[in-house]
């Protein structure tokens, strides 16, 4: 039977080759071929994905259960910690841009040399309805003014040791909105500890690693090491010092006289309580092992070693937060993906550590739940481009005060507002999007500020290290293909469990 013919080729034959586009697919700045960059970005995405690694599900689930059990033991030691909390778990640590904490010292940790994968866990201490807040209209911070009672709980008495003086002259700036929101979070009950964690009757004195800050160097024991896996050298500037307690005024029903909840003291209490529990743990065979805990810029970083080969080191940034119902006045209510605020809208207050913070009592506004919902609406090629740019940026910002990782995440949202969705969704444009994000970041570092995505009229600041980072970024931008190849090779080594090779002699 004769075959049908389209032109001069049978219909079952191969399609004609696509026309070559070498003259239009070259990066003007570096001369790199965009097609090669896109292929490297896709390969990096495959290598950095833990979903295809050896037994990742069991490792991650055990580690998550271990952390939740640890928080349950914290509640047993100090009832102020909520017995049941609606936790929000984010992939990526704070040093990878999961949250905005300003340009604060975040410790010496670097993904690869010190840990294989990072996560951020927001732990609400309690919830407010927004009437207790006093927003600073010129910044991204707020004061939490505590009344005598919240939902029948003597909240002021409970947090007596973390209170500061009232803040005069501020006003309440929270209101509720009527639009809709769709965001999902992780819920976990932490009232019953799992079998992965057991506790001694009395704390055990643990030997400190000589390469870490000893207990005598920090009055609040801001670094605790329970093993010798990673020789993390923590300089004194990398560790948040204990805040000086402020005098507490006598209780008064006038809101202007309500004492404020000091974020620095809450962060210090959170770490001290968690460290006391961590020092009293009994290792359980087959369970993750907590080997390091330290406090940085208002949050606590813990490192867990997985029990089975290939052994991995997981980083969890635990941050005590206050959950606030409502929506801040002047905040964005819609995005390219739809409404952000609804009748059930809420946001968080986190203990920020930036130098622009008005005082030690101030809390930074955080929209992690909304960002989680936005991320689900970002086209996959753009997410790949962002992950690649983040991987290239990682060695440049390790150990610095630069806020570049979260600035890069914010540029991701602005790109979705500015560029056509069809362009961002095309896989072949991942290389161009990655270069575009790096170029935009360079312009932000040069300008020193970036408009806040959620808070209209507010600015994110780049930090004191932006000038040095700008020079490093320019050198990287001159040969992005080489930087991507190096990132792919590092990801391959880490995927095989090589990220821990030679760290602390391989002991976990």
From Swiss-Prot:
Residues 172-184 have a biased composition (Basic and acidic residues). One of its GO terms (cellular component) is plasma membrane. One of its GO terms (biological process) is response to cytokine. The chain crosses the membrane at residues 261-278. InterPro entries: MAB21L/cGLR. It is found in: Cell membrane. Residues 279-508 are cytoplasmic. Keywords: Apoptosis, Cell membrane, Membrane, Transmembrane, Transmembrane helix. Its main location: membrane. Residues 1-260 are extracellular. The keyword tRNA-binding does not apply. It is a single-pass membrane protein. Interacts with CSF2RB; this interaction occurs preferentially in the absence of CSF2. Selectively involved in CSF2 deprivation-induced apoptosis via a mitochondria-dependent pathway. This is Transmembrane protein 102.
């Amino acid at each position: 039977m004769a075959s049908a013919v389209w032109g001069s080729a049978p219909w079952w034959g191969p399609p004609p080759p696509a026309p070559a586009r070498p003259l239009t697919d070259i990066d003007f700045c570096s001369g790199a071929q965009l097609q090669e960059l896109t292929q490297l970005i896709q390969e990096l995405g495959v290598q950095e994905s833990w979903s295809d690694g050896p037994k990742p599900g069991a490792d991650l689930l055990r580690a998550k259960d271990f952390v939740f059990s640890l928080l349950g033991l914290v509640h047993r030691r100090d009832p102020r910690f909520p017995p049941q909390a609606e936790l929000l778990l984010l992939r990526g640590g704070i040093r990878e841009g999961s949250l905005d904490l300003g340009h604060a010292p975040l410790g010496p940790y670097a993904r690869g040399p010190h840990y294989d994968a990072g996560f951020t866990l927001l732990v609400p201490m309690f919830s407010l309805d927004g009437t207790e807040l006093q927003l600073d209209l010129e910044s991204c911070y707020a004061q939490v003014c505590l009344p005598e009672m919240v939902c029948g709980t003597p909240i002021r008495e409970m947090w007596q040791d973390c209170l500061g003086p009232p803040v005069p002259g501020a006003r309440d700036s929270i209101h509720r909105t009527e639009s809709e929101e769709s965001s999902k979070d992780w819920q976990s009950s932490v009232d019953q500890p799992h079998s992965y964690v057991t506790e001694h009757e009395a704390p055990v004195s643990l030997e400190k690693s000589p390469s870490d800050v000893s207990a005598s160097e920090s009055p609040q024991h801001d670094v605790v090491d329970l093993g010798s896996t990673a020789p993390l050298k923590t300089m004194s500037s990398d560790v948040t010092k204990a805040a000086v307690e402020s005098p507490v005024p006598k209780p008064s029903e006038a809101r202007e006289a309500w004492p404020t909840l000091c974020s620095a003291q809450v962060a210090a209490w959170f770490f001290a309580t968690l460290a006391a529990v961590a020092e009293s743990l009994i290792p359980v065979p087959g369970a993750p092992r907590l080997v390091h805990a330290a406090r940085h810029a208002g949050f606590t970083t813990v490192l867990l070693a997985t029990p089975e080969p290939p052994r991995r080191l997981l980083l969890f940034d635990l941050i005590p937060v206050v959950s606030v119902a409502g929506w801040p006045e002047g905040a964005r209510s819609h995005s390219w993906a739809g409404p952000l605020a609804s009748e059930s809208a809420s946001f968080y207050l986190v203990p920020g550590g930036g130098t622009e913070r008005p005082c030690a009592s101030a809390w930074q506004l955080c929209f992690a739940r909304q960002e989680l919902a936005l991320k689900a609406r970002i086209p996959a090629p753009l997410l790949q481009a962002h992950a690649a740019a983040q991987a290239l940026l990682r060695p440049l910002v390790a150990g610095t005060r630069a806020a570049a990782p979260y600035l890069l995440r914010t540029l991701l949202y602005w790109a979705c507002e500015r560029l056509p969705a069809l362009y961002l969704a095309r896989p072949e444009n991942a290389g161009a999007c990655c270069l575009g994000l790096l170029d935009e970041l360079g312009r932000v570092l040069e300008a020193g500020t970036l408009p806040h995505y959620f808070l209209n009229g507010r600015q994110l600041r780049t930090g004191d290290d932006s000038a040095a980072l700008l020079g490093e970024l320019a050198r990287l931008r001159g040969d992005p293909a080489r930087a991507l190849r190096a990132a792919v090779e590092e990801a391959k080594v880490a995927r095989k469990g090589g990220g821990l090779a030679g760290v602390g002699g391989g002991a976990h």
